[in-house]
């Protein structure tokens, strides 16, 4: 895990109660408080890559409002410092392609607020792209709740679905002064990683750590301790970090 995503390290208010309202009529809303990022192919535009932390290219004011009101795919990301943050994902670049960076690259280069906002945007955009049709009746679905749900367009169905999140564990296994690492055949020579895997139904996260470690290496572990968590929208995980002893 490259960087901590501790919730206390950003001041983003998800403002979930606003999702089912007309945000533009909210008592604190003003056009000059709109902030909009236009993503392209899961990449985000950077204003200036010569300074760190990198600065996201946020559209503001009336231009941002026009994009949001004319789009059927705008996502409300939350509130911060009195501003209303949104994102839209487009199929053609709005700016020069060399302005766009993927989130893996941006991860250690953004401040915590921007990183939290873009992580939210990428995870939700991926889910929307994979859920355009109803899983019950097969009818086309449409975005609702400012990007935080989809609803079936079939009046006889109207099934409402919500974003998927897959819990995954990643663990540092140690024995005395050694640590247990793994690698995949397709990785470059010399590249190794701590072990990781998805949590399955009917098990605790600690059991998932022990199971994944044994399945991948044949090593039994003890003293499993949870450490930290972070969003991992590649494509839709919540990564749970552990330490354990072999």
Residue ranges of predicted features:
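N-terminal alpha-helical interaction blocks
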Residues: 1-111
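A gly/proline- and charged-residue-enriched helix-loop-helix capping module
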Residues: 94-136
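The catalytic Nudix box helix
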Residues: 194-228, 242
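Active-site-adjacent beta-strand/loop module that shapes the phosphate/pyrophosphate-binding cleft
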Residues: 230-246
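N-terminal strand-loop-strand
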Residues: 44, 150-194, 220, 244-246
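A residue-level detector for short acidic-glycine micro-motifs
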Residues: 79, 173-175, 228
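Cys/His-rich short segments
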Residues: 119-172
């Amino acid at each position: 895990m490259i960087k901590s995503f501790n919730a206390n390290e950003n001041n983003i208010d998800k403002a979930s109660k606003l999702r089912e309202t007309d945000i533009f009529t909210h008592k604190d809303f003003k056009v000059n408080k709109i902030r909009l990022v236009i993503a392209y192919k899961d990449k985000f535009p950077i204003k200036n890559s010569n300074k760190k932390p990198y600065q996201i290219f946020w559209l503001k004011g009336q231009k941002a409002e026009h994009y949001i009101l004319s789009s059927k795919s705008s996502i409300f990301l939350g509130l911060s410092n009195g501003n209303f943050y949104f994102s839209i994902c487009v199929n053609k670049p709005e700016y020069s392609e060399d302005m766009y960076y993927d989130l893996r690259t941006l991860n250690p280069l953004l401040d915590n607020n921007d990183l939290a906002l873009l992580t939210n945007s990428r995870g939700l955009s991926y889910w929307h792209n994979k859920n355009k049709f109803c899983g019950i009746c097969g009818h086309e679905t449409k975005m609702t709740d400012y990007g935080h749900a989809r609803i079936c367009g079939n009046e006889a169905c109207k099934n409402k679905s919500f974003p998927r999140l897959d819990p995954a564990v990643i663990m540092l296994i140690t024995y005395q002064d050694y640590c247990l690492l793994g690698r995949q055949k397709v990785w470059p020579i010399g590249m190794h990683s701590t072990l990781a895997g998805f949590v399955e139904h009917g098990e605790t996260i600690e059991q998932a750590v022990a199971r994944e470690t044994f399945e991948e290496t044949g090593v039994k572990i003890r003293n499993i301790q949870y450490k930290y968590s972070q969003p991992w929208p590649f494509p839709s995980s919540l990564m749970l970090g552990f330490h354990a002893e072999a």
